[in-house]
């Protein structure tokens, strides 16, 4: 694979999701059907990408959340690529953050990792299904502790 333009901007999963969703809506409104094989390929790529991306945390993000998140990360000395990974993947453990931040052992203390983790989990929305599972599991644990 060859890099055509190394200065191209990086896009978050949220931006790709919004772009493809808008493109899909425009096609519906214009009523254009699949005519050429190129158009069919584009439709397939759009469909598969939306299918994958809609299962990620970006589905619950908004421009305001992204802006707030990036502003909160200014105090951490992270590269653009690292910020993008944190935004796209919404890590919930210190290990996940250490995997996303290059040379994290040298660059970040445990306190900084915990602060970064708190920033990620407090600003970026969680998957509703994950929250429900978490609540269900904690209720089950409470029921097991209280045999009354």
From Swiss-Prot:
Q: Which GO terms describe its cellular component?
A: acrosomal vesicle; cytosol; DNA polymerase III complex; nucleoplasm; plasma membrane; RNA polymerase III complex
Keywords (alphabetical) are: Antiviral defense, Cell membrane, DNA-directed RNA polymerase, Immunity, Innate immunity, Membrane, Nucleus, Transcription
Kindly list the GO molecular function terms attached to this UniProt entry: calcitonin gene-related peptide receptor activity; DNA-directed RNA polymerase activity; nucleotide binding
List this protein's GO terms for biological process: defense response to virus; innate immune response; neuropeptide signaling pathway; transcription by RNA polymerase III; transcription initiation at RNA polymerase III promoter
Give the UniProt family note: Belongs to the eukaryotic RPC9 RNA polymerase subunit family.
The protein's job, in short, is: DNA-dependent RNA polymerase catalyzes the transcription of DNA into RNA using the four ribonucleoside triphosphates as substrates. Specific peripheric component of RNA polymerase III (Pol III) which synthesizes small non-coding RNAs including 5S rRNA, snRNAs, tRNAs and miRNAs from at least 500 distinct genomic loci. With POLR3H/RPC8 forms a mobile stalk that protrudes from Pol III core and functions primarily in transcription initiation. Pol III plays a key role in sensing and limiting infection by intracellular bacteria and DNA viruses. Accessory protein for the calcitonin gene-related peptide (CGRP) receptor. It modulates CGRP responsiveness in a variety of tissues.
Name the UniProt record assigns to this protein: DNA-directed RNA polymerase III subunit RPC9
Identify the coding gene. CRCP
């Amino acid at each position: 694979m060859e890099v055509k333009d190394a200065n191209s901007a990086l896009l978050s999963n949220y931006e790709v999701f919004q772009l493809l969703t808008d493109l899909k809506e425009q096609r519906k409104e214009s009523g254009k059907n699949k005519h050429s094989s190129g158009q069919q390929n584009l439709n397939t790529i759009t469909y598969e990408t939306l299918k994958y991306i809609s299962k990620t945390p970006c589905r619950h993000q908004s421009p305001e959340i992204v802006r707030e998140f990036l502003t909160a990360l200014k105090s951490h000395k992270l590269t653009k690529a690292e910020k993008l990974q944190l935004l796209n993947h919404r890590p919930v453990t210190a290990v996940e953050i250490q995997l996303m931040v290059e040379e994290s052992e040298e660059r970040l203390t445990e306190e900084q990792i915990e602060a970064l983790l708190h920033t990620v989990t407090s600003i970026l929305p969680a998957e509703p299904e994950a929250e429900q599972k978490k609540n269900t599991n904690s209720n089950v644990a409470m029921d097991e502790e209280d045999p009354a």
